[in-house]
Amino acid sequence: TSADANTVVTEDMTLYAQWSDPAVDLDVTVSYSNVNEAGEVTWTNQDVTVTLTANEPVQSIEGWTLDETQTVLTKAHDKNGTYHVTVRSADGQEKEVEYTVSGIDKKAPNIKIGGTGNGENYREIKSIAIHDPEGISYLMINETKTEINDKYKYFTDIKALGVVEGTNTAVVVDNAGNETKITFGYDKTAPTFKWIVDNNTQAQSKEVRLETSEEIQLPDEGWSLK
C-alpha cells in the first residue's frame, strides 16, 4: 500500500570507511665517516664517506651507492669542500641537500734543519723547524718524542729534542697521521790527523799520506781516498 504523509520509512544502511596514509614529505639527513660521537670532525688522511639517509625509498643517483632498503646513499670524497645533490623519492618528491666535507689532509708535514755541513751531515745545527698548515701532532728524534699540537714550531735546543752525535732519525707526524722521516748526521768533533811519508822526509817523499780519525772530504783532485 502507498504510504501517506505521516508514515516514516526506516532502512538499515552499512557504511564503509576507507583510510589512506597521509602524504610524507621527503626528509634526508647527512652523516660523515670522520665525525665522532661528540659531533666533532676528526682529521684523516683517507677519503671521507658521506651517508645520506632518507625517511622513505629514494631513487639511485649517479656516483652514489644505494643500499638494499633504498633509503641510504653513500659516496666517498677525497677532497674537502661544499657539495650539492638532488635526492628524489620513489614517488617523485625532490630535496636539495647541501653538505660540507672537511678534515681531509693527505699532505705530509715539513721539517727543516738549519745548520752548517755537507749535504745531510752537519757539524753545527742551529735550529730545527717543523710546519704543517693543518697542525702537527708530534716530533720524534731517535727515542725522544716531543708533543707539538701546533701548526709551526722552531727549536734551537737540539739536545732536548734528542739529537746526538752520529746518525739521527727524525719523524714528524701531523694530526691526520701523515709523516715525514729524515736521517741526518751530526758531528761537532773535529777529526785528528797525522802525516805519513814513505821515507820519513816529507820534502823528498814521492807519496804523502794523511791519516784521519774519520772520513773527510778530499782537499783537491790530487788526493785519493784509501
Mark where each language-model region is.
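Low-complexity, disordered linker/stalk regions enriched in Pro/Thr/Ser/Gly
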Residues: D21-K226
